[in-house]
A protein has these predicted regions:
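FAD-binding core/adjacent interface of flavoenzyme oxidoreductases
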Residues: 1-6, 62-145, 221-223, 227, ...
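Mid-to-C-terminal Rossmann-like scaffold of FAD/NAD(P)H-dependent oxidoreductases
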Residues: 2-4, 276-370
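Beta1-alpha1 glycine-rich phosphate/pyrophosphate-binding loop at the start
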Residues: 2-73, 161-182
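Glycine-rich Rossmann-fold phosphate-binding loop(s) that bind the pyrophosphate
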Residues: 9-12, 128, 150-152
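Rossmann-like dinucleotide-binding cores of NAD(P)H-dependent redox enzymes
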Residues: 60, 154-210, 290, 308-316, ...
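A conserved short coil-to-beta-strand element within the FAD-binding core of flavoproteins
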Residues: 77-88, 204-216
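FAD-site-proximal beta/loop scaffold in flavoenzymes
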Residues: 120-141, 221, 226-299
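A short, polar/charged loop-to-alpha-helix boundary motif
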Residues: 367-381
Length: 383
């Protein structure tokens, strides 16, 4: 008797792999185990639910039952895997032990919230899943004043979307400029200026000392003594890969679950996919690399070993006040910039100061068409 391929997780990576695999193999049994309800949705859509006046159910593309039927999989929902026995090739759930032929870890990531002082830290909202949004949506709808902690991509997108839906928004970060991992300060300041003109308040270069509740208000105390009064506090301070199961199973783990070019972990029959996986030395949190990895792994498990090749990928920021597309390396002291501006926006090219080679680029507004010729000039990764 052959055992099924078991997938742990039901996010984009897991479902993309299932759909890709089913195009190649309609017969191998697949069992998916997920801690949530298994509904198929697009996580990036969480960044603009407020301006679109959407609730959680609006984001569901396909129910868990519909997905399972369409792709001929067994779907076990609202269930946690408690242990993996790599030697026996089993996973434990509740009072059952299931045997796999191959195992795919698509356990995703969790929102990082530092251990702040104060009595209201358990009231901080994160929006890293449909389930989290569903739990918080009533508070978010009724809130008028919202403080967003973290001015990276997700925090900036959420702050802009909240302000677009007429909320009073304060965006906080210990960095001195917004989008510090994506934009050089002189371009980050342009996004900040536009957001400020649209009503967003900024508290940059400031840490958080405490978060407390006082009657109906949440009070965010900054390290300079300033206090921000809010109805709701959202943390968008980065993600951490869910690697606990992999660690318990004895797999090699760094920032994510370490995989080779075939998405194979340190165990020959266990693979990892999505933003729990560390491929070519990095955790990949964006859609395109996850999609390419899922397609390659589908071919590998269907019988044709296929290494993952990652061409340079375009990141499209959901910042409608200043639409941005970027790729490659766009921050660092080793970069020098060449910028062309016109009424359509700007094209900013980053060159390595020593080699003069193109390292990355950022295009704004209607200059998006300039991105694709530049994208072809950037190196990819993998075979």
């Amino acid at each position: 008797m052959s055992h099924p391929i078991i997938v742990i997780g039901s996010g984009f990576a897991a479902y993309q792999w299932v759909k890709s695999f089913r195009k190649l193999d309609q017969d191998t049994e697949i069992t998916i185990i997920t801690a949530d309800n298994g509904d198929d949705y697009s996580k990036p859509d969480l960044s603009h639910v407020f301006s679109r006046q959407q609730c959680a159910t609006d984001l569901v593309k396909q129910s868990a039952t519909e997905f399972a039927q369409a792709n001929s999989v067994k779907l076990i929902t609202n269930t946690y895997v408690t242990a993996i026995d790599a030697q026996a090739k089993t996973v434990s759930i509740d009072d059952q032990v299931l045997t796999y032929s191959n195992l795919i870890l698509a356990t995703g990531s969790r929102a990082f919230v530092p251990p702040f002082a104060g009595n209201a830290t358990d009231e901080i909202i994160t929006l890293n899943s449909l389930q989290e949004f569903e739990q918080a949506q009533e508070r978010l709808i009724t809130a008028k004043r919202i403080t967003v902690l973290g001015a990276g991509l997700i925090g900036t997108e959420i702050a802009m979307d909240l302000a677009s839906s007429h909320k009073q928004v304060t965006l906080c970060d210990k960095a001195s400029s917004i989008l510090p991992a994506m934009l050089p300060p002189f371009l980050g300041s342009e996004v900040q200026h536009t957001m400020a003109l649209n009503g967003v308040d900024f508290k940059l270069n400031r840490g958080i000392s405490a978060i407390n509740r006082h009657h109906q208000e949440m009070l965010v105390e900054l390290d300079n003594g300033e206090v921000i009064s809010s109805d709701v506090v959202i943390a968008a301070m980065g993600l951490r890969s869910n690697t606990q199961l992999a660690q318990q199973a004895g797999l090699m783990v760094n920032h994510g679950i370490v995989v080779n070019q075939y998405m194979q972990t340190s165990d020959a029959n266990i693979y990892a996919l999505g933003d729990c996986a560390e491929l070519y030395g990095r955790v990949r949190a964006f859609i395109q690399p996850t999609m390419l990895a899922a397609m390659a792994l589908a071919k590998t498990l269907a019988g044709t070993a296929t290494p993952v090749r990652l061409p340079a990928s375009l990141v499209k920021a959901k910042t409608p006040w200043i639409p941005l597309n970027l790729a490659g390396k766009t921050v660092g002291s080793e970069l020098t910039w060449e910028i062309q501006r016109n009424s359509d926006g700007y094209v900013a090219k980053a060159f390595h100061v020593e080699t003069s080679e193109l390292s990355g680029f950022i295009v704004s507004h209607d200059q998006a068409k300039a991105a694709f010729p530049l994208l072809r000039l950037l190196p990819g990764e993998g075979a």
